[in-house]
Amino acid sequence: MQESRRHFLAASAFALPALSTAIQAQSTPSRRPKLKITDIRTAEIRGHGYQVHVRIYTDQGIYGHGEATDSAQGAVPLIQGFRRFLIGQDPLNIEAIWERIRTGGIFAGAQGGQYVTALTGIEIALWDLAGKALGLPIYQLMGGKVRDKIRVYCDSANHHPDDPQAKAKLKEIETMGFTALKFDIDEANDAARFDRMNWTASNGEIDRMVKEVAFVRESVSKKVDVAVDMHGRYDATTGKRVAIELEPFRLMWLEEPVPAENVDVMRDIRQATKTPICCGENLFLRHGFREVLEKRAVDIIMPDIQKCGGLLEARKIADMAHVYNIPFAPHCVVSPVGYMASCHVCAAVPNFMVLEWHWISRLKLWKEFVKEGEIIEKGFVTVPDRPGIGVEMNEEAAKTAQVPNTSWFRPGV
């Protein structure tokens, strides 16, 4: 017994220093780079639509790159006005910076539109910067990834049965490996439209829509999902009629049959049809999605990550939708820089469904826009493990799409 006690004490004498070292190592604060924001710069590009690229620079030579879209025209003065919230700040305090900018504009339109679009570009740049500073991909900073590859659908605008090239174009999309596509069925210049100010479609317009959907559905194989977009350009009566008439085609979704701001009408259409209803590209922040989700007005939500408030805000919107068992299928029309940023969110949320791609008519620019080259392979994006967003702009290619008479990442005052 005495011998066992001596053995225990001797072993403890050797073990205690090691244990003490381990405890000390665990209690030592983690070391991270001490950074301060020194500048914010912008560039304006016309890709599919109008995009503002944002770079946030630091005193350690690291910069982050973000991208905002759609209501980006007019966002640059707002972004420069936000310098007062940014210069001298620690860029890793993303939530604090985001909230200061948002609450600082409560009386200046911070509920949506250009203000939130400008904030979005900044927020995405901060996430890219944080990932680079910490040596981690953005998805890892958002809790890790639940998938390695992101399913992509090709938005291909219009497909008229009388266009001799239409069927070949659709087949090309399928040959490229896409398992889903979307096209538009709203048409302001429809010959059957009697009054451009009246949002009630005539029988002729609805017949034309049904004919186009039938043509597309027959032109691709059954394994390719088909969605259609009405861009919120019709009234409640038309939206309901179209949704019901398209039921036999088993669409992936019908997008914005009516304007998104009337949630009750959207809900009425959803309840009247088997066709899945989708909206969200024109909503901003979590607050814009709350009523849509609470009233179960849609089957699928599609926030635009480059204008809804940013990566973390999109993650929060997806999490809200997940509570209601509603899938998350983001709208996305941006360059490969913003596109890959969106992919990090899609990789991190369980209820992701599919991500839009709208550059099929700009393939050369798309493939050359980032140094890494093409990021979509056979209808999927593999999320990179590189720090931050994981792709870098090829400025020589990107400059070919620069908006005339705008600056190119010019240093601030």
Task: Please annotate each region the language model reported.
Residues 76-77, 84, 89, 96, ...:
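Shared catalytic-loop signature of beta/alpha-barrel
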Residues 62-134:
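Metal- or metallocofactor-binding catalytic centers and their adjacent structured scaffolds
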Residues 1-16:
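N-terminal secretory signal peptides and thylakoid transit peptides that target proteins
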Residues 37, 61, 122, 135, ...:
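Conserved, mostly hydrophobic/aromatic
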Residues 123-159:
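Glycine-rich, aromatic-flanked loop segments that form ligand/cofactor-binding clefts
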Residues 149-272:
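Metal-dependent enolase-superfamily TIM-barrel catalytic cores that perform enediolate-based chemistry
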Residues 19-48, 54-56:
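C-terminal segment of N-terminal export signals and the immediately downstream linker at the start
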Residues 389-413:
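Extended hydrophobic packing segments that form well-structured cores
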